[in-house]
Amino acid sequence: MENGKEKFSLFSAILSVICVVFVAEAAAPVAAIGNSQFFWWIVLIVAFLLPYGLITSELGTTYTGEGGLYDWITKAFDHRWGARASWFYWVNFPLWMASLAVLCPDLLHTMFGFQLNTGISLLIELIFIWVIVLISLYPVSDSVWILNGGAVIKVFLALALGGLGVYSALTKGVANHYTLASLLPSFDLHSLSFISVIIFNLLGFEVICTFADSMENPKKQIPQSIIIGGIVIAAIYMFSAFGIGVAIPTNKLSTSSGLVDSFQVMLGTPTGWFISLIAFLFMLTLVGNMVSWSQGVNNIASYAADNGDMPKFFSKRRASNGISWGAALMNGIVATFIVVIAPLLPNQDLFWSFFSLNLVLFLLSYIPVFPAFYKLRKIDPETPRPFKVSGSDGILKVYMALPMIIIIISLIFTAIPLQYDKASLTEQLPITIGAIIFIVIGELIIKRKLQVQVSQPSSSHMNSYS
């Protein structure tokens, strides 16, 4: 320990990466792709995770501190792009929080068997949201037991699901038969709309960089935890996805309850102590997700606010520990608004409605990271790089372009309606409209800041927006 602060060991850092990057609730939407998910996993692990992991390791160990991707993008380009990235990166979090909150009433129903009315369900969702807000007001090292516990529970759920899948496949057969044709991509628009979930499942490594001050040796631990954690996470995802695919036909899979449904099908019962335990553990992983992400998201939002690139309210911090209560409070307010208006939405698959919108905004924040990596190599070659991606200039361009192109293509399939039947429009139009609304709000914030900087020529950011 140093200065009385508990430090992350490498083991804790790896578990934290697993807790951050592996999100159990995303297993079912990925399984909705069908058997071809394994093809996409392999392709995206090589074409996306590898360059993304290498780039994040270099940027995270070279440019340390609270800013994360906001810092990288701002250094490479300007504050306008940094402001966009910080806005998308922050606003996805309360949407994600809302998507997990709406799962809690159904999980409690599975655990205890009683039906909840709308008022009680809303109360449970609000309790989930504001408990997360409260926990996020304390340093991440104070919650290390939540991070480690969340990682262990997620791994247990994935191994149990995959193990039951193997047993069921050997004894009862599979719901989705495996053929060479089914393992190859079909390129139907419904399946392709879920590809962004795989990318989401492979993102998040940069959050570990915001824990640098809590690590024993961040320059070594960050790349080690990303590499080891990435290998473990890829294996966990594919094993758990196999279990879901064994249990439930793809066309009957629920994106919100698919994980618990799979246990119920393979065990042959919708109730019982083990099913209740699975639902309880699954709910604990939702808390772990929010706690592990809240610190990094709030840090970046408040740091950007300090630099004039987010509304000033986000920069408000607790005097006792420097944690941003402004960003935490805004998380709670936005998530509360979302769950309150949820019953009015046309698509009542609320988890997917909010989760997919969170996906779109989250992925948007990453697009500038990859060109920022390449540009920083060109304009800032003298800065020491404890971990440096090797390769020629051509290889670096491939590392830059490949993940960026993959994100853009996945966004098109997720956010833009490419089929015009009523069911498709009901599912995708709210995502499209929601994304446009949040993009416009972000641009209005940037425009307002630009006007303020023009009226205050002494500001250090005035030229950054030009």
Swiss-Prot record:
Pfam families: AA_permease_2. Gene3D superfamilies: Amino acid/polyamine transporter I. It is found in: Cell membrane. Its main location: membrane. It is a multi-pass membrane protein. Keywords: Amino-acid transport, Cell membrane, Membrane, Transmembrane, Transmembrane helix, Transport. The chain crosses the membrane at residues 8-28, 30-50, 85-105, 120-140, 144-164, 192-212, 226-246, 273-293, 325-345, 350-370, 398-418, 426-446. GO terms for molecular function: transmembrane transporter activity. GO terms for biological process: amino acid transport. It comes from the Bacteria. InterPro entries: AA/rel_permease1, APC_superfamily. Coiled coil: none annotated. GO terms for cellular component: plasma membrane. Belongs to the amino acid-polyamine-organocation (APC) superfamily. Glutamate:GABA antiporter (GGA) (TC 2.A.3.7) family. Probably catalyzes agmatine/putrescine exchange. This is Probable agmatine/putrescine antiporter AguD.
